[in-house]
């Protein structure tokens, strides 16, 4: 039998149950709940008010590098890796279930070289390409500039985003390392072009010096 609730002037709301064997009791909670809440069941007929849980941004950190840095090539193989100045943040997670959205933007320049970048948590690479082919450099991201002379005046903005789940409440550091993956080439520059970053820099207006950043957002699970 359906239960019909008539409106004060017109219309009604009718509650009905399917034709099924057995009896079921639903117990309503005390009170009217709060704005935006919904009724949930405990699986045994008990109803209660609950709030929708979604991820929220708990904290935001940022590292900014406005200077100039270079990475030398190796004699016949990739040069050494090194931290990019100021592109690091040290934090303590609010919860072990927190996730972290890391966004890195690097302004780089050079010609006849291959800049490679590595996203790290403490001393561990947390995102690397795995499709090795011969002597391929496996990095988080990077690019290659040909020997075209025009590239010595250019800068590119390289950007990547990644969500990390460190599962800890201990202090951690997110950072970016750089490397010149081209052997016997010329230097890779952060925040300037090759023409503007070399020992005898070209001071003309067409050489743009930029900025690089790392931003980390802690998101509740």
Ranges and model annotations:
Residues 57-68:
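Short amphipathic
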Residues 12-14, 25, 88, 159, ...:
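Well-ordered beta-strand positions in beta-sheet-rich domains
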Residues 83-85:
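Short, solvent-exposed loop/turn segments enriched in Ser/Thr/Gly
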Residues 1-57, 96:
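Extracellular repetitive beta-rich solenoid segments
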């Amino acid at each position: 039998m359906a239960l019909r609730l008539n409106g004060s002037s017109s219309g009604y709301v009718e509650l009905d149950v399917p034709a099924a064997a057995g009896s079921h009791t639903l117990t309503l909670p005390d009170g009217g709940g709060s704005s935006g809440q919904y009724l949930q069941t405990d699986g045994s007929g008990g109803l209660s008010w609950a709030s929708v849980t979604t991820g929220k941004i708990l904290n935001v950190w940022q590292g900014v590098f406005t200077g100039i840095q270079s990475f030398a090539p190796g004699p016949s193989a990739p040069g050494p890796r090194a931290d990019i100045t100021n592109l690091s943040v040290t934090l303590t997670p609010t919860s072990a279930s927190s996730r972290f959205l890391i966004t890195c933007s690097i302004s780089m320049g050079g010609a006849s070289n291959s800049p490679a970048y590595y996203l790290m948590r403490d001393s561990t690479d947390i995102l690397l390409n795995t499709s090795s082919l011969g002597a391929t450099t496996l990095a988080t991201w990077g690019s290659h500039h040909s020997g075209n002379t025009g590239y010595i005046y250019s800068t590119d903005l390289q950007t990547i985003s990644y969500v990390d789940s460190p599962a800890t409440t201990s202090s951690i550091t997110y950072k970016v390392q750089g490397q010149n993956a081209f052997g016997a080439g010329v230097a890779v520059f952060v925040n300037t072009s090759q023409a503007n970053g070399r020992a005898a820099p070209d001071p003309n207006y067409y050489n743009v010096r930029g900025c690089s950043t790392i931003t980390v957002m802690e998101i509740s699970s």
